[in-house]
Amino acid sequence: FEVSENLYADLAYLETLWNYAFKMSGDQDWLFGAYSLADVFFAPVAARIACYKLPVSQQAQQYVDKHLAHQDFRQWRAMGLTKHYDPFPYNMPCASVPWPGPRTIAAAVAQGPSENETCPYSGDAVTDFLRIDGRVFGFCNPFCRDKTLVDPAAWPEFMALYSTAKA
């Protein structure tokens, strides 16, 4: 889509804010040095910049990329994608790109039985299943399954199970 003058102005102002914060923190990875609520606040903005390939400076793009790779961001996104909306709120009539964040492991909803008897998150008995690389894993509810379906590598508890040899 064509970036409007107003959007260019908003992006320039955003970069002015970010650059000031980086300067104050000594040009660390996050706005004020360590990851903070300021970074959490700008996470959805970073996602929009990435999805619509909005024109930003190299430093701003590095900050956006840092968000996309951050475990908390990946988990937040995965949990959000477990809910489907019809109609989709705030749908914009412009082209976007496939998710530019880290590539995920291909997964699909499956039937049991599973390699594991308890959910990697809660420790509860499994009732819902997911297939990855020909292996079936169990979860205690559809939400635990679906957040893992979206981005398995965002979840250390699951990856610990996934990295073990098949039982």
PLM regions with names:
Residues 119-123, 130-131:
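Short cysteine-rich clusters marking metal-coordination/redox-active sites
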Residues 1-74, 79, 106, 110-114:
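GST-like fold's C-terminal all-alpha helical module
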Residues 145-162:
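Short metal-binding segments enriched for Cys and/or His
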Residues 116, 127, 134-137:
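Residues immediately within or flanking Cys/His clusters that coordinate Zn2+
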